[in-house]
Design a protein with these regions (language model features):
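Specific aromatic-rich, kink-prone transmembrane helix
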Residues: 117, 157-175, 183-191, 205-208, ...
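Short acidic/glycine- and proline-prone juxtamembrane loop motifs at membrane-interface regions
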Residues: 147-157
Length: 304
């Protein structure tokens, strides 16, 4: 059963939840919330501002060289410098710490909107729009998303490109053999950006690649094109691996023991964070979901 016709009382419940979720998200910004523990001007933001200043004030080549730890200039991050390159050259609000934080907060609001559109793009014929808004609000409850939104941290850039990637992935799956190369190019581009924004998100392009190669109904030629696009977009990252001698910048690699020590517990930690944002997709994956509203009580019954 699909959620096209919703009870009026349930619509009211949905509206109230949506309103207060969005309101609390906005209030969190004005009160400088730090629910994940990494925010604050003395927290991770000081590294963010240092890295941004590096690409804002130095020659591009010198700044890139600094990520390899070969200079007295310090680059402090486990991610590639793409976040800082884009902001240094494209973000007009980087003259002060406060204006930069505001710009990332606005960017995060767009990320939330993009989450809504990615859900709507996939389920628009099956689910009432208000229910999609309700499901998309889950991202506003994440302490990681909230803290990154309020303190200009790095995490939300990867989340942003995940949602864009899923929009193009859905378009390709819906079109099957009629999918065009432009959509395939954009899918490869944005899902590759996921890795540049956070190496852990390598799972995203791998998922798309394997799905379209094995289960996808696109033509063989387009499958080859997809592989070639991914190969081309991986070249800058291959250069960074050559520059660093590792998959993350030198200073963080040495501090974390990357490729030297395996932290098994981090696998569960990372998967938990990623899975949080996929809850609406997993919830809606079930075809037989029955919604029951009796005596002002809401219950959901899933039939396998």
């Amino acid at each position: 059963m699909v959620f096209q016709n919703l009870n009026k009382n349930f619509k009211l419940y949905i509206f109230v939840v949506i309103f207060f979720t969005i309101l609390l998200f906005l209030i969190g910004f004005f009160f400088q919330e730090n629910s994940a523990g990494a925010g604050g001007f003395e927290g991770d933001f000081q590294h963010v501002w240092n890295n941004l200043s590096l690409f804002k004030n130095y020659d591009f080549r010198d700044a890139l060289k600094a990520t390899a730890g070969q200079d007295e200039i310090k680059y402090i991050s486990s991610r590639t410098p793409l976040i800082y390159i884009l902001n240094a050259y494209l973000n007009p609000l980087i003259e002060s710490k406060y204006s930069y934080i505001i710009s990332i907060f606005i960017f995060s609001i767009f990320t939330y909107c993009l989450f809504y559109f990615s859900l709507k793009n996939k389920y628009q014929d099956k689910i009432n729009s208000s229910f999609i808004v309700f499901l998309s609000c889950i991202i506003l409850l994440s302490p990681y998303f909230r803290t990154s939104s309020y303190w200009g941290l790095e995490e939300n850039f990867g989340i942003f490109t995940i949602f864009i990637s899923f929009i193009f992935f859905t378009r390709i799956k819906n079109k099957n053999k009629s999918a065009n190369n432009f959509d395939i190019l954009l899918l490869a581009f944005f899902s590759s950006l996921c890795v540049y924004f956070d190496q852990k998100l390598l799972i995203i392009p791998l998922f798309f690649l394997f799905d379209l190669m094995i289960e996808g109904k696109i033509s063989l030629r387009k499958k080859i094109n997809l592989s070639l696009f991914y190969l081309v977009f991986s070249i800058p990252f291959m250069y960074l691996i050559y520059l660093w001698g590792n998959i993350i910048p030198v200073r963080d690699a040495e501090a974390r023991g990357t490729l030297q020590t395996i932290y098994i517990e981090n696998i569960g930690y990372s998967l938990t964070i990623i899975a949080f944002y996929f809850v609406p997709f997993l919830f809606l994956k079930k075809k037989n979901i029955f919604f029951i509203l009796k005596n002002n009580k809401i219950s959901i019954r899933i039939k396998g």
